């Protein structure tokens, strides 16, 4: 068996992020956007197998470059009067560059993410609805890692016995156990496959009660005479 341990990094520097985003809203409901993220000293933990001994290390390092560029779209729609849905799609380009111990890497990867949110009205009279959501992320990269795709299916039953006052939600997450991340490393001196077996499934019961009413303060009119209006 390989002995694994955490290896410190006294040269680790703080990470900074610069983000830019532009959105266009069509007919007050369809959203289309472009975005770019530039990371300086991007920090991630990577895995290294010692070439001279039967041991391995986990170490957090700074990447020389980590950029993401992408486009997204949000499409809401209804099916009859009982189903309200929202479809979200995004496509991204990842750029990772740096040196991890003695392994230089310069990689690019195109991948996508799909999400679908659905609300089914089971009973308007009893204020009972069912939420079923699904998400899929295509295979991507992280430094020297190749990361397999992951998916999540969740569902929640929502009951509002007192509208705008009391709500009860029973919710389940990761119903199909699709959030178990799998990574692969395939370099001349580094070959490994890793699966995170932590169980991410969960069931929760939420009770929410709103006390009183929110009274909005009267807004004062702005004196625009000084602007020549």
List each language-model region with its residue ranges.
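Residues that define the transmembrane beta-barrel architecture of outer-membrane proteins
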Residues: 16-20, 26, 65-69, 106-114, ...
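C-terminal beta-signal and adjacent terminal beta-strands/loops
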Residues: 161-229
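Residues on the lipid-exposed face of transmembrane beta-strands in outer-membrane beta-barrel proteins
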Residues: 12, 20-26, 71-77, 116-120, ...
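Transmembrane beta-strands of outer-membrane beta-barrel pores
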Residues: 28, 36-40, 91-97, 120, ...
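Outer membrane beta-barrel strand-and-loop segments of large Gram-negative receptors
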Residues: 7, 13, 31-88, 97-113
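Short, small-residue-biased leader/transition segments that mark boundaries at the very start
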Residues: 2-4
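Repeated loop/turn-to-beta-strand initiation elements of outer-membrane beta-barrel proteins
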Residues: 28-32, 81-87, 124-130, 163-168, ...
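C-terminal beta-barrel architecture of Gram-negative outer-membrane proteins
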Residues: 114-160, 166, 171-177, 184-188
């Amino acid at each position: 068996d390989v002995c694994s341990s955490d290896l410190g990094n006294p040269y680790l520097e703080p990470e900074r992020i610069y983000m830019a985003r532009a959105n266009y809203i069509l007919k007050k409901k369809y959203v289309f956007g472009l975005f770019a993220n530039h990371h300086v000293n991007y920090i991630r933990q990577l895995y290294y197998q010692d070439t001279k001994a039967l041991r391995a290390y986990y170490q957090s390092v700074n990447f020389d470059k980590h950029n993401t560029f992408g486009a997204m779209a949000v499409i809401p729609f209804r099916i009859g009067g009982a189903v309200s849905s929202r479809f979200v799609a995004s496509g991204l380009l990842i750029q990772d560059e740096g040196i991890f111990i003695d392994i230089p890497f310069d990689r690019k990867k195109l991948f996508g993410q799909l999400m679908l949110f659905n609300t089914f009205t089971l009973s308007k009279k009893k204020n009972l609805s069912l939420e079923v959501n699904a998400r899929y992320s295509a295979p991507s990269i992280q430094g020297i890692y190749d990361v397999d795709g992951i998916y999540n299916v969740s569902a929640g039953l929502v009951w509002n016995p007192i509208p705008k006052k009391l709500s009860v939600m029973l919710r389940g997450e990761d119903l199909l156990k699709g959030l178990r991340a799998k990574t692969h490393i395939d370099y001349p001196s580094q070959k490994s496959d890793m699966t995170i077996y932590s169980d991410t499934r969960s069931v929760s019961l939420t009770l929410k009660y709103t006390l009183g009413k929110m009274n909005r303060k009267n807004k004062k009119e702005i004196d625009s005479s000084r602007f020549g209006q």
